[in-house]
């Protein structure tokens, strides 16, 4: 059995997080995603008692394209995932991967001191979490 120190999520998370309002239409959100090169957007909380949401390409594919809805007529809040599971930046990468598997998710905001400091995904876990790839 090989024991390896995979390191913390902090080492592979993306720190340039783009947040949008849930009232934004999906077409505008997709334009933002394309412009910043993001595969997900964090949907802002409406107040301190609210939770974060996330918009993924899979939400758009399943809830807009597959249902033949016009993206300019659908609001982000209608199709986003909410509430979302969050992870800590000091969480071990292998536990983050297990969390994703156990809950069927592929992205999660990274939260420290009640603020989003990054985003982590399977893509980032694999390509930036494996030390032998550097």
Report residues per predicted region:
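Tandem CBS (Cystathionine beta-synthase) repeat/Bateman regulatory domains
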Residues: 1-134
């Amino acid at each position: 059995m090989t024991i390896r120190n995979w390191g913390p999520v902090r080492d592979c998370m993306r720190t340039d997080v783009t947040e949008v309002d849930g009232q934004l239409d999906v077409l505008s959100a997709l334009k933002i995603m394309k412009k910043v090169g993001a595969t997900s957007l964090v949907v802002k909380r409406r107040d301190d008692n609210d939770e974060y949401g996330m918009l993924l390409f899979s939400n758009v594919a399943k809830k807009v394209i597959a249902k033949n809805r016009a993206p300019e007529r659908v609001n982000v809040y209608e199709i986003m995932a909410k509430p979302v599971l969050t992870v800590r930046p000091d969480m071990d990468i292998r536990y983050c991967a297990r969390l994703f598997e156990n809950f069927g998710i592929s992205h999660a905001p990274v939260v420290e001191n009640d603020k989003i400091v990054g985003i982590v995904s399977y893509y980032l876990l694999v390509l930036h979490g494996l030390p032998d790839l550097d």
